[in-house]
Swiss-Prot record:
Subcellular location field: Cytoplasm
Alphabetized HAMAP family for the sequence: Pantothen_kinase_3
Identification of the protein by name: Type III pantothenate kinase
Pathway(s) of this molecule: Cofactor biosynthesis; coenzyme A biosynthesis; CoA from (R)-pantothenate: step 1/5
Reactions catalysed according to its record: (R)-pantothenate + ATP = (R)-4'-phosphopantothenate + ADP + H(+)
Binding positions for K(+) per the UniProt entry: D130
Active site: D106 (proton acceptor)
Keywords: ATP-binding, Coenzyme A biosynthesis, Cytoplasm, Kinase, Metal-binding, Nucleotide-binding, Potassium, Transferase
Family from the record: Belongs to the type III pantothenate kinase family.
GO MF, any single term: metal ion binding
Keyword Transcription regulation: no
Highest taxon of the lineage: Bacteria
Known partners and oligomeric status: Homodimer.
Length: 256
């Protein structure tokens, strides 16, 4: 089996693949004190992978301080090659990005999976939206060229910024209200954050699409993709775990 790891800002998400089939997904949300402790990751991964035979692993990370700890923890559990995704590896598209050394590898994985699954065979441009802690937009031109995209705040960051930057606005649970007209401070915040996120994604998708020569395929993924797919008024594909699928794809493509 192939193990795909996505070391994110809030948690480490993992997927086990048999061929191209995703057979199991799990996540680990470490306490801050343990996030860079290799022995913690060794214990967590040893438990999670007790019944799995891992023959190859791939990893993307947006938290450099955790990358080495997770990798060392994994190497203490499985005797398998580990491919760490990087912009200089073999990719399913050409990079047209001014600063590839700063390109998040989670973005690269999402774009690779989105292009391969939804755009390449049809020679159709693709826009991937990964809605998590941040909202990442990836643009792949129909010629197979990654053009870049955009990065914005996700729902949790918006809520935290409003709470931290104001004197009286409370912390609120992130539930989408039925109407955008908030009749209380709580529902007004929920509306501004979540309906605002939905409209932001819809507006950005349209702006990015206008830069392309064809009608691109819009693909949604990430932890906040469910309310988006339910409420956008434009057509989109829903592709859960797209980053993990991209990690698998790139690890296989670059397997020694």
């Amino acid at each position: 089996m192939l193990l795909a790891l996505d070391v994110g800002n809030s948690a480490v998400k993992a997927g086990l693949f048999s061929g191209d089939e995703l057979v199991r997904v799990f996540s680990v949300d470490p306490p801050d004190a343990d996030a860079t402790d290799a022995s913690y990751w060794r214990a967590e991964l040893d438990s999670a992978l007790a019944d799995a035979t891992v023959e190859h692993a791939g990893l993307v990370s947006v938290v450099p301080a955790r990358t080495d700890a997770v990798a060392r923890g994994l190497r203490g559990v499985v005797d398998a090659p580990l491919t760490i995704v990087a912009p200089e590896m073999a990719l399913p598209f050409t990079l047209d990005y001014d600063t590839p050394d700063t390109l998040g590898t989670d973005r690269l994985a999402a774009a690779a999976a989105g292009w391969t699954r939804y755009g390449r065979d049809a020679s159709r441009s693709v826009i991937v939206v990964d809605a998590g802690t941040a909202v990442n937009y990836e643009v792949v031109h129909r010629t197979g060229t990654y053009r870049g995209g955009a990065i914005g705040p996700g729902a949790v960051l918006m809520r935290n910024a409003l709470q931290a930057g104001t004197a009286q606005l409370p912390d609120v649970p992130l539930h989408l209200p039925e109407t955008p007209v908030g009749s209380s401070t709580r529902t007004a915040l929920q509306s501004g954050i979540l309906w605002g996120l939905i409209d932001s994604v819809q507006g950005m998708a349209a702006r990015l699409a206008a830069q392309l020569p064809d009608a691109p395929r819009l693909v949604l993924t990430g932890g906040w993709s469910n309310p988006l797919i339910d409420h956008l008024t434009i057509e989109a594909a829903h592709a859960p775990h797209l980053v993990l699928r991209g990690v698998r794809l790139l690890a296989e493509k670059n397997r020694a």
